[in-house]
Amino acid sequence: WATSGLDTHPIIIARHTKAKPRANWSAAEDERPLAGTGKRQALALARLLTAWEPSRVLSSPWLRCVQTVAPYVNEYSLTVKEKKSLSEAGAERHPKRTAKTIASLFEKGTPALVCTHRPVLPVVLDAVAEHLLTKKQKEHLPAKDPYLEPGDILVLQVSAYERGGIVSAEVVRPFTD
């Protein structure tokens, strides 16, 4: 360890923070914004993300996801790559594109943050499971709906040596109101 170290990078999967309730929203679903709690959660998430310093940020283009990553992106002058495949509609229509988006993160080798929605998480988690080093590790991934609560993140540490294999996975809840 002293000479080589453990060479990993994080891939962080975030469920957007608390949005205004669907029942109280009459405009387009992709325009539904964060609730007050969600805005506070997004600020807390931005502070927490500094522990991993993701330099690549991908997000669903839907407003609540973009608003979730905005405090972090703005603080560090990063850009958000909006991916339709990470939206609810995109993942429903083209789940293979969603899986490909996630798989590409393992090929890049850079710290990354992905923000998406609860209904997209099963596709995302299936794509993540392809990069586990052992089948036993799957028990450490969220397995039941809602998978992640609003604002939760799944932090994956990915090995540079094991073909993009995941060496650890942890769910972190940055804020509760």
Language-model segments: residues:
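Active-site-proximal alpha-helix that buttresses catalytic centers in soluble enzyme cores
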Residues: 1-2, 6-95, 99, 103, ...
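Generic beta-sheet signal
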Residues: 11-12, 107-116
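Conserved beta strand-loop-helix elements of the APE1-like EEP
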Residues: 111, 156-159
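Short glycine-rich anion-binding loops that position phosphate/pyrophosphate groups of nucleotides
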Residues: 118-120
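Short, solvent-exposed aromatic-acidic interface loops
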Residues: 168-177
